[in-house]
């Protein structure tokens, strides 16, 4: 699976894989599918753009 082709602000299901339960972007070193720096930079931009458009939450409610 080629992630650069799939990483887009409209592809919310792929972006949710790289966000933890609090809505934060998971660091590059902790991602399960290892992303390159360029791919992670594209991921960050796409997540931020999806947040601005209301497709992803900025922060979810705390469970505690």
Swiss-Prot record:
Keywords: Chloroplast, Plastid, Ribonucleoprotein, Ribosomal protein, RNA-binding, rRNA-binding
InterPro entries linked to this entry: Ribosomal_bS18 (IPR001648), Ribosomal_bS18_sf (IPR036870)
Disulfide bonds: none
Main localization of the protein described in the UniProt heading: plastid
GO CC, alphabetical: chloroplast; mitochondrial small ribosomal subunit
Gene3D superfamilies the UniProt entry points to: Ribosomal protein S18 (4.10.640.10)
Location of this chain's protein in the cell: Plastid, Chloroplast
Family note: Belongs to the bacterial ribosomal protein bS18 family.
Subunit structure: Part of the 30S ribosomal subunit.
Protein name (Swiss-Prot/TrEMBL): Small ribosomal subunit protein bS18c
Species this chain originates from: Euglena gracilis
